[in-house]
């Protein structure tokens, strides 16, 4: 049993750690026959009445006064424990020391947490082993305990390594965010400086957002820019080539700018994390965030742009959970006459009142499939309803008026020439 209490490196006392505090227990006797200071042991085990504890829980043969254990003035053997006194005072000599058996008796009777663990070890492991095998191998238990400690130490090391990695990742992400924020500030600053330098120049270029009915339900939008209005019109033709009516693209946002490339470059840089594919211009983002963000870039609002950039998690959450915002298509005829060099046309002076009234009646009764108004189908409907009107040489003007009237009736209608 002495393997449970290692006295090989002890001399005057042994030190144990309990509740994160070190306690010293004075020793006497030899390594083979050790004695422990009863008072010190009782204090460690939480006994309030030391004299009563020694009387109740330690047998007479397991306790001796120090004066009977010490050989005062004699030569101590090499394994002698405790101090060698030249003179032992009366009080020191009366101090009660207990044998190893007495020590275990006090432990077995104590309510201290580690004493309960010791009792379980003795009653559940050691004694059953002696009953079954006639002996108990402490080495096996110590080996198992050491393995458990090694596993615990390994787990703690792995946890520390993981925490270190997480700290490094957070630090790197913070450094990257600071660097990205600095770069964005510089980029927006250059855009602002450019806008300031060119504010007297009339904006003739365009930034647009377009989508389809299906894309709009999926929070998907194409964001880009063109140099002229004619290119803006042809852009839809490019997008819609080979597409069915239900997949036709339409504009939901158009703004003029002095230099669309600088705006487009800023948008691509700041919204790169929301692009469906890095090689195309399709973005996945809730429209409410997207339009505010594009407006912020167009207006040179660096603070809002950075706010959006720093709230990517919220943007992603809104994109996943919020219902899509449905925006009606923009009819290019509503803006085409405001280009530089163009004079507004008064279509009411081109067509007579009877033709305009017939077009309005046709619009009121027309129900286009999938909200797509095709020119030829509408003309057939118009002539079927009003066969007396003449459209020769006026088809384009009639179509323009029909689109203007149709946009008033249903902003969601799209038009195909």
Swiss-Prot record:
Residues 152-193 form a coiled coil. Residues 4-134 form the Bro-N domain. It comes from the Viruses. It holds the Pfam family Bro-N. The keyword Acyltransferase does not apply. Keywords: Coiled coil. The keyword Coiled coil applies. PROSITE patterns: BRO_N. Belongs to the IIV-6 201R/289L family. This is Putative Bro-N domain-containing protein 289L. It comes from Invertebrate iridescent virus 6.
């Amino acid at each position: 049993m002495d393997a449970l209490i290692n006295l090989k490196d002890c001399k005057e006392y042994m030190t144990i750690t309990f509740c994160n505090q070190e306690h010293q227990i004075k020793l006497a006797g030899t390594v083979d026959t050790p004695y422990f200071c009863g008072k010190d042991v009782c204090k460690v085990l939480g006994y309030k009445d030391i004299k009563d504890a020694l009387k109740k829980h330690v047998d007479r043969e397991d306790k001796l006064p120090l004066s009977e254990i010490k050989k005062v003035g004699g030569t101590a053997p090499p394994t002698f424990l405790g101090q060698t006194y030249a003179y032992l005072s009366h009080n020191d000599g009366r101090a009660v020391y207990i044998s190893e058996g007495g020590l275990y008796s006090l432990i077995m009777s104590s309510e201290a947490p580690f004493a309960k663990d010791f009792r379980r070890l003795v009653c559940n492991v050691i004694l059953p082993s002696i009953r079954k095998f006639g002996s108990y191998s402490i080495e096996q238990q110590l080996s198992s305990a050491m393995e458990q400690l090694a596993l615990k130490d390994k787990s703690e090391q792995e946890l520390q390594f993981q925490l270190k990695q997480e700290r490094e990742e957070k630090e790197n992400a913070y450094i990257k965010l600071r660097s990205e924020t600095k770069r964005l500030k510089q980029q927006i600053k250059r855009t602002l400086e450019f806008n300031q330098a060119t504010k007297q120049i009339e904006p003739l270029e365009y930034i647009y957002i377009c989508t389809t009915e299906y894309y709009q339900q999926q929070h998907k939008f194409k964001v880009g820019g063109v140099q002229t209005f004619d290119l803006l019109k042809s852009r839809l033709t490019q997008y819609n080539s080979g597409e069915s009516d239900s997949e036709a693209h339409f504009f939901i946002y158009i703004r003029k700018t002095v230099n669309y490339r600088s705006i487009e470059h800023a948008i691509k840089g700041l919204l790169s994390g929301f692009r469906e594919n890095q090689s195309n211009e399709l973005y996945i983002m809730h429209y409410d965030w997207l339009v505010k963000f594009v407006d912020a870039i167009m207006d040179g609002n660096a603070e809002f742009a950075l706010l959006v950039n720093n709230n990517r998690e919220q943007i992603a959450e809104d994109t996943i959970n919020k219902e899509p915002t449905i925006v009606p298509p923009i009819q290019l005829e509503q803006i085409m006459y405001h280009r530089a060099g163009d004079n507004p046309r008064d279509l009411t002076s081109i067509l007579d009142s009877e033709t305009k009234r017939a077009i309005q009646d046709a619009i009121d009764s027309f129900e286009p499939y999938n909200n797509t108004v095709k020119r030829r189908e509408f003309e057939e409907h118009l002539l079927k309803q009003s066969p007396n009107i003449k459209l020769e040489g006026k088809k384009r003007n009639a179509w323009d008026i029909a689109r203007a009237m149709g946009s008033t009736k249903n902003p969601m209608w799209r038009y195909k020439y």
